[in-house]
Amino acid sequence: MAFGDKAESLGAEVKTYHLNGMNFKGCQGCYACKTKQDSCILKDDLTEVLEAIHEADVLVMASPVYFWDISGQLKSFVDRTYSYLRPDFFNRPDPCRLPEGKKGLLILTQGAEEREHRDVPQKYEHFMEHYGLHDRKTIRGAGIHESATAEDRAPYVQEAEALAREWCGR
């Protein structure tokens, strides 16, 4: 919450969505977003989130790393963003339907040491790049357990707050 709290204190409008408390399905692979309309055809709690991202200047995704990847909830969200891609996205210089100029932040925590799960940030940085989030950053807290103290978390909080000042300062 450090990024959002700092951004809000700087005057930015912040919308926070807790995916775990939402009722939504993962991508159905129906391709309706490529053949019938320019958005996901499913209508559920995630619809508002997917629409809000079109208006947002910054997309922040945060997740613990569980079993070698982001949480299932965030992965299901990522899958649903397939609807942002144009039908012929592999053959285009502008594969994504999102407006240009957005920034992306991925915040990951993991109990494992730094050397573990190194592929996770790379995978989702590529995702952000593919979606046109050219100004992007990952904050990765390795060795952070539920019992981590405020002192343990301080470097990551400071990094998030500094990035909020850089991206959202007026």
Predicted regions and their residues:
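Short, glycine/serine-rich, charged loops/turns that create anion-binding
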Residues: G21, G111-A112, G143
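Hydrophobic anchor at the start of a short beta-strand
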Residues: V14, D135-R136
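Short, glycine-/small-residue-rich phosphate/pyrophosphate-handling segment
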Residues: F89-H134
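Residue-level recognition of beta-strand->loop/alpha-helix junctions
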Residues: H18, I139-R140
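N-terminal beta1-alpha1-beta2 submodule of the flavodoxin-like/Rossmannoid cofactor-binding fold
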Residues: M1-R86, E146-R170
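Short hydrophobic/aromatic-rich motifs at helix boundaries and adjacent loops
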Residues: G21-M22, L46, L50, P95-L98, ...
